[in-house]
């Protein structure tokens, strides 16, 4: 146990040493405002590249919320990611400071948006003819591959809303899917708001098969894919929104391969139009 504590202490000492060597001083980086899911946030970053990362979402509107990132925030974010890796049985790794800053901003905004009935969910979301379809599941199940097949199938009719972590706003009339800068390794997102027509839980399969499932059958899978805050009150709100989401949007379960026919099968079922 003592050795583990010493290793943790050494890792965080190294983290702060690297941070002070390479961090751009905060007073030298201009603040900016961006709009995510209808929320305008003023961001005071540590790194110049953060503004560029968020460029499609920049706005001149008056901010309603503010995020200022510190060195302590980056260390805390690293510890959160390490805990997630341990929980999922993955290898612990050190993330770059700019990445940790972006993740910190994302987490703060996601937590704040819960009060506006908006939750962030891990999944790849594509829109076709003005309706959005979200594909979710554990890492490695082929979410990005599946939405790429949709784009190949529909061409200009398909718009990539977000390839990794879209925001979903629950309203009295349905659910709206929003793009965001946090869009995975491929950086595929569009600053749009589109009605969500369905959520599909993907699994790898040899043959393509999709079926509708009930909210009761899908809710546990949905819980595992939503953004889970650190604060317990926020956690309860996130779980409550997941319950609402399951009752507002059709849920599907699919086993699929990587052939173009997989996109045809999922679209035909979720849209109700056979192609």
What are these regions (language model features)?
Residues 19-92, 96:
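Long, basic/Gly/Ser/Thr-rich N-terminal segments
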Residues 146-147:
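Post-Walker A alpha-helix
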Residues 143:
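Conserved lysine of the Walker
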Residues 24-28, 37-52, 64, 95, ...:
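Glycine-rich, often acidic-flanked micro-motifs
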Residues 59, 110, 114, 152-156:
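Short, intrinsically disordered, mixed-charge
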Residues 6-8, 12-17:
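N-terminal amphipathic/hydrophobic targeting modules at extreme N-termini
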Residues 77-129:
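Extreme N-terminal, non-catalytic leader segments
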């Amino acid at each position: 146990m003592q050795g583990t504590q010493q290793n943790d202490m050494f890792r965080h000492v190294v983290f702060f040493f690297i941070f002070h060597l390479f961090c751009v001083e905060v007073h030298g980086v201009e603040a900016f405002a961006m709009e995510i899911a209808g929320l305008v946030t003023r961001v005071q970053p540590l790194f110049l590249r953060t503004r560029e990362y968020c460029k499609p979402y920049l706005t001149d509107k008056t901010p309603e919320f503010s995020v200022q990132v510190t060195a302590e925030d980056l260390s805390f974010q690293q510890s959160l990611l390490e805990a997630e890796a341990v929980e999922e049985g993955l290898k612990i790794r050190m993330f770059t400071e700019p990445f940790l800053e972006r993740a910190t901003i994302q987490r703060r905004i996601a937590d704040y948006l819960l009060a506006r009935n908006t939750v962030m969910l891990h999944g790849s979301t594509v829109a076709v003819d003005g309706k959005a379809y979200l594909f979710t599941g554990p890492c490695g199940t082929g979410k990005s591959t599946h939405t790429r097949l949709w784009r190949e199938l529909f061409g200009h009719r398909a718009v990539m809303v977000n390839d990794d972590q879209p925001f979903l706003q629950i309203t009295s009339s349905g659910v709206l899917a929003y793009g965001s800068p946090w869009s995975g390794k491929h950086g595929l997102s569009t600053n749009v708001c589109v009605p969500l027509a369905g959520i599909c839980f993907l699994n790898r399969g040899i043959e393509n098969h999709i079926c509708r499932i009930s909210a009761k059958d899908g809710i546990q899978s949905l819980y595992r894919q939503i953004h889970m805050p650190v604060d317990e009150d926020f956690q309860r709100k996130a779980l409550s929104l997941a319950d609402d989401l399951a009752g507002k949007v059709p849920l599907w379960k699919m086993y699929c391969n990587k052939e173009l026919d997989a996109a045809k099968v999922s679209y035909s079922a979720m849209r109700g139009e056979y192609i």
